[in-house]
Every structure is written in structure tokens, then in C-alpha cells.
Regions:
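Glycine/small-residue-rich loop that forms an oxyanion/phosphate-binding "nest" at active or ligand-binding sites
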Residues: 1-23
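C-terminal helical cap(s) of enzyme catalytic domains, especially alpha/beta-barrels
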Residues: 134-159
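Catalytic alpha/beta core domains of metabolic enzymes, predominantly
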Residues: 9-10, 22-129, 138-145
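Flexible glycine/acidic-rich beta-alpha junction loops that bind and position SAM and/or redox cofactors
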Residues: 2-6, 77, 133, 170
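Flexible, glycine/charged-enriched surface loops at secondary-structure junctions
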Residues: 159-166
Length: 174
């Protein structure tokens, strides 16, 4: 509680609002932090680590202030990682949430999680925070090489990459 109270106090004291802030639903006091951000007009990117987190987001009452639901998979076994991503995605899909659903893997399961996400029609994210390795197992020289591999993965599926040309969302409540 003390940590979330400090976070809320920091949010209330912001001089300049960020476009969005990522809040992990597995952290204590996440609801208070999300509500404080939304009151300030800051979009929330909800970091989901478990099926319970996905359910909590759906029932939280903060979805109108969410720009994105980030399905974060840290499971180390490929089949289990993909299964967990699918279970979390199913909770969000059934609830027909409006925020973008983005999948994000970790370590050796990153590329399996991303491939699965693309098959589901979801957005993906990759960088050195997630993995140091390319899909073929070789060491990446940097973020650009990881992103390049993800772009090729997207193009192989015949999908478009939206980003800078996408219309920006206004702040929550506007």
C-alpha cells in the first residue's frame, strides 16, 4: 500500500503527462495507480502476466482508459508459453475489450509467442528486453536486428505493419 500511495502521489505531481504509462497488474496497488493515471488524462498500458491478471483487467472498470492490454509471457517452455498466451487472449477476446491486445514473449520462447500472436491477429513487440537471440538461435547484434526479424515474420504472413502512420488516440476521457 505504501508503494502504491507513493506512486499515486508521484502521478498527481506530474508537471507533464506522458502519452501512456505501463502498469503491471501483478503489482500491489495497480488499480489505484491506473485510476490516478486516467484521472490525469494518461492512457494505461495494462501489463498482464497471468490469466488472473486478464480477468482482473476485464472486471476492473478501467478499460476505457486503457490504450493497450499487454500479454506478457515469461513461461520458459514453448508449448506452455503459447498455451498461456492463448488462455489470456481468450479471456480478453471473450470480453470484447476495445484496447489493442499486444503479445510480448521472453527468452527462448519469444519467437513462438510472437508467431502465435500473429496467427491470432494480435500486435507484437520485441526488443533486447525480451530476448538476445534471433529466431534461428543466433545472437542479435541489437534491437534493430530483432525488429527486422519480427518485420520479416509479419511480412511472411502477408500482414501490414501499422505504426507511425496510425491515427493517434486522444487522452482518456476526451
Amino acid at each position: 500500500e505504501k508503494i502504491s500511495a507513493r506512486k499515486v502521489s508521484s502521478i498527481e505531481g506530474l508537471k507533464v503527462n506522458p502519452d501512456f504509462a505501463s502498469v503491471n497488474l501483478n503489482e500491489e496497488g495497480w488499480r489505484d495507480v491506473c485510476k490516478a493515471l486516467i484521472r490525469r488524462g494518461v492512457w494505461v498500458e495494462a501489463g498482464l502476466w497471468t490469466v488472473a491478471d486478464a480477468r482482473s483487467l476485464v472486471s476492473s472498470g478501467i478499460l476505457d482508459g486503457c490504450v493497450r492490454a499487454l500479454v506478457e509471457i515469461t513461461e520458459k517452455r514453448p508449448k506452455q508459453a503459447v498455451s498461456l498466451a492463448n488462455q489470456m487472449d481468450e479471456v480478453l477476446r471473450r470480453a470484447r475489450i476495445k484496447p489493442t491486445i499486444l503479445h510480448h514473449g521472453y527468452g527462448q520462447t519469444t519467437w513462438k509467442v510472437l508467431e502465435n500472436a500473429l496467427a491470432l491477429g494480435r500486435d507484437i513487440r520485441v526488443g533486447l528486453e525480451d530476448t538476445l537471440y534471433l529466431p534461428d538461435g543466433s545472437l542479435a547484434r541489437g534491437n534493430a536486428q530483432l525488429v527486422g526479424a519480427a518485420v520479416r515474420m509479419v511480412h511472411r504472413r502477408g500482414l501490414l505493419i501499422l505504426g507511425l502512420d496510425s491515427p493517434a488516440k486522444t487522452s482518456p476521457g476526451s
